[in-house]
Amino acid sequence: MELENIVANTVLLKAREGGGGNRKGKSKKWRQMLQFPHISQCEELRLSLERDYHSLCERQPIGRLLFREFCATRPELTRCTAFLDGVAEYEVTPDEKRKACGCRLMQNFLSHTGPDLIPEVPRQLVSNCAQRLEQGPCKDLFQELTRLTHEYLSMAPFADYLDSIYFNRFLQWKWLERQPVTKNTFRQYRVLGKGGFGEVCACQVRATGKMYACKKLEKKRIKKRKGEAMALNEKQILEKVNSRFVVSLAYAYETKDALCLVLTLMNGGDLKFHIYHMGQAGFPEARAVFYAAEICCGLEDLHRERIVYRDLKPENILLDDHGHIRISDLGLTVHVPEGQTIKGRVGTVGYMAPEVVKNERYTFSPDWWALGCLLYEMIAGQSPFQQRKKKIKREEVERLVKEVAEEYTDRFSPQARSLCSQLPNKDPAERLGCRGGGAREVKEHPLFKKLNFKRLGAGMLEPPFKPDPQAIYCKDVLDIEQFSTVKGVDLEPTDQDFYQKFATGSVSIPWQNEMVETECFQELNVFGLDGSVPPDLDWKGQPTAPPKKGLLQRLFSRQDCCGNCSDSEEELPTRL
């Protein structure tokens, strides 16, 4: 019914825009949902938290911000963080401006006459940097100085930070991060598509207004297909990878009937839709090259964690609101142990490398093959080994993959043809990306000569296409085929062990990013204006335990715990 689709789309668009109010999609009870505990409630967390400088002060977004606030109270530490910020800026500065940026860093932070000389820096190292800067401003010029600065901060300053109110506030945020996650943490919206074990729908965190995609894995369907290991593998790999070019896992929870993965919402649709349903099939070369470069960065991040993807194809590459891509659907990914190879005839016909088709052993070579196939398809408007809407038997496609070279038209420039021929090389030992240098080999190809990969990796390059914010890039609600009911499968108490491994709640870095991006951190992270300790951080003012509720109070009181508050009277309609 057309009306149902219009209503579902209208509700989703309104949610994406923040609901039209000042709260930007937040519940009217959001402060109550994110209320800090008294610091005395965080003592167990304090004792169990690993004292790792890199994790607490660099990798975790809220930890990094609070450590910077602590450093701002001491001039010598402020100089160190300013230097680190300056180096980060230097590394993403365009080539023609980098030398001037490097000279400013040398003058301000490394010269005895500079205003912000950083401590503990060997003068010989400074001299070497100055000489290298004159010869040519390479991106890693300040790498050793950066390492020494972090080493300095990780000693006495880090120890002092652990005894400060800033670290106590970090413990309060960690306490909130570790609160239980349930279906009541979210508002649910329309179905966006189907996964292997259930629907994918849009959802919104009540406390922050942040939009996500919720991938629901039906418990009975998982059990019937014996998919427990596959589902847990995807969840654990998503949890491990932190890349702007791979969808992020923010939450994992369970309901009575399903296991739920809450992932980055990609509103721009997938590359298959854009290649074939937005005018003439295929992209201009510049657009295809931009997407190939971002996919290359995503594969590099996966391979750095020794993860091979194995299912690279247009429908698994999604666009965000701004037009940047992320790799999605990690169901076939697998970890490759150091020094070992793996075996597995998995993937999608037409994108599987010859060594996969032959069931031979491999490490990361199938991903570089598939990148070549995808780049070819983006430029040519069709797959290199099968024509769209023309049925070819699987055996014939696999023969073409193993034996026949791809054909090129005049849509390919010489550089594009060169890269496309080197990536899908039949021999994995000769394939670009597999000659010992990994992603670096691919990035150094002349087709990417005009791209600054440092700026690309920082999200600083403008994409060639920006999706329409008023468009819904997916099928109509009624065109998404519904799953049939699973019969003959009963859930048993022994299944709970698997569900507990899966439903682990919030994922640290995405959750903290959510708090920062939605300005919850900015609004809640308040200290005493006159330097006084806030009541929730004051050990002297420990709260008294509230009186026990009577039976009737317990029966009729509303659940008001962090993230699980229901505020249905103010909510937008959910999926019809």
Curated annotation (Swiss-Prot):
EC main group: transferase
Record keywords: ATP-binding, Kinase, Lipoprotein, Membrane, Nucleotide-binding, Palmitate, Phosphoprotein, Serine/threonine-protein kinase, Transferase, Wnt signaling pathway
Chain positions found as Phosphoserine: S484, S566, S568
Domain AGC-kinase C-terminal: 449-514
Region of interest called N-terminal, as start-end residue ranges on this chain: 1-185
Modified residues (Phosphothreonine): T485
Record-annotated Protein kinase domain positions: 186-448
One Pfam assignment: Pkinase
Occurrences of domain RGS (ranges): 53-171
Residues covalently joined to lipid (S-palmitoyl cysteine): C561, C562, C565
Subcellular location per the Swiss-Prot or TrEMBL entry: Membrane
Topological type in the membrane: Lipid-anchor
InterPro entries: AGC-kinase_C (IPR000961), GPCR_kinase (IPR000239), Kinase-like_dom_sf (IPR011009), Prot_kinase_dom (IPR000719), Protein_kinase_ATP_BS (IPR017441), RGS (IPR016137), RGS_sf (IPR036305), RGS_subdomain_2 (IPR044926)
GO CC terms of this entry: cytoplasm; membrane
Active-site residues, record numbering mapped to chain: D311 (proton acceptor)
Entry's Gene Ontology molecular function annotations: ATP binding; beta-adrenergic receptor kinase activity; G protein-coupled receptor kinase activity
SMART domains: RGS, S_TK_X, S_TKc
Superkingdom of origin: Eukaryota
Catalysis: reaction(s): [G-protein-coupled receptor] + ATP = [G-protein-coupled receptor]-phosphate + ADP + H(+)
Function, as annotated: Specifically phosphorylates the activated forms of G protein-coupled receptors. Such receptor phosphorylation initiates beta-arrestin-mediated receptor desensitization, internalization, and signaling events leading to their desensitization. Seems to be involved in the desensitization of D2-like dopamine receptors in striatum and chemokine receptor CXCR4 which is critical for CXCL12-induced cell chemotaxis. Phosphorylates rhodopsin (RHO) (in vitro) and a non G-protein-coupled receptor: LRP6 during Wnt signaling (in vitro).
Complex formation: Interacts with GIT1.
Family indicated by similarity: Belongs to the protein kinase superfamily. AGC Ser/Thr protein kinase family. GPRK subfamily.
Protein name: G protein-coupled receptor kinase 6
Organism for this UniProt entry: Rattus norvegicus (Rat)
